[in-house]
Amino acid sequence: MPSILERDQIAAVLVSASRDKTPAGLRDHAILQLLATYGLRSGEIRNMRIEDIDWRTETIRVRHSKTQAYTLLPLTEPVGEAILVYLRSGRPATDARELFVRTRAPYRKLDKLYSMVRRRLRDAGVKPRGKRGPHIFRHARATELLRAAVPQKIIGELLGHRSIASTAPYLKLATEDLRAIALDLPGTEVSA
């Protein structure tokens, strides 16, 4: 079963990462903001380009790595601020158009995010069950949206899914979570 991060755990990871003012720390904080806010896939972040951020309209264009379709999302203030700080103070001077690059030469796009996410979870003292890679932020975002009664179709669109069936595995955990809460209510009985 995939891990689910709760809102307070996500906040702890973001606060912990924001304290690291090194170039890698500024980059990681911006990436974690994207993961936490939008539930993006690792590949969507790694392939994000500088021109995908439109500061004038305050939007971010996301190319979904599985479907190659684009989604235009509102650029939230925390995400925009983290990206801006990274661009001004953390990103090395390079001709690479990818937004997030390695902090050491050769400056090219990141290969993977898994080890960075694992390290940042550990640094924040967050110990989720099961896997600890970037995808747990995606599951957390989908679960949070379902708990907020956002329709499954909208959740799927935000996650870049072409079909509602693709969204179902993300929502199964939230449904089980809600069922567990219902079973704990006084006066409810479970029949075997």
From Swiss-Prot:
Coiled coil: none
Keyword Transit peptide among record annotations: no
Organism listed in the record: Sinorhizobium fredii (strain NBRC 101917 / NGR234)
GO BP, one annotated term: DNA recombination
Family recorded in the similarity comment: Belongs to the 'phage' integrase family.
Keywords: DNA integration, DNA recombination, Plasmid, Transposable element, Viral genome integration, Virus entry into host cell
UniProt keyword Ligase, yes or no: no
GO MF term (any one): DNA binding
InterPro entries found in the cross-reference section: DNA_brk_join_enz (IPR011010), Integrase-like_cat_sf (IPR013762), Integrase_catalytic (IPR002104), Tyrosine_recombinase_XerCD (IPR050090)
Residues of the signal peptide: none
Superkingdom to which the source organism belongs: Bacteria
Name used for this protein in its record: Putative integrase/recombinase y4gC
Domain Tyr recombinase: residue ranges: 1-183
Active site per the UniProt annotation: R41, K66, H135, R138, H161, Y170 (o-(3'-phospho-dna)-tyrosine intermediate)
SUPFAM superfamilies: DNA breaking-rejoining enzymes (SSF56349)
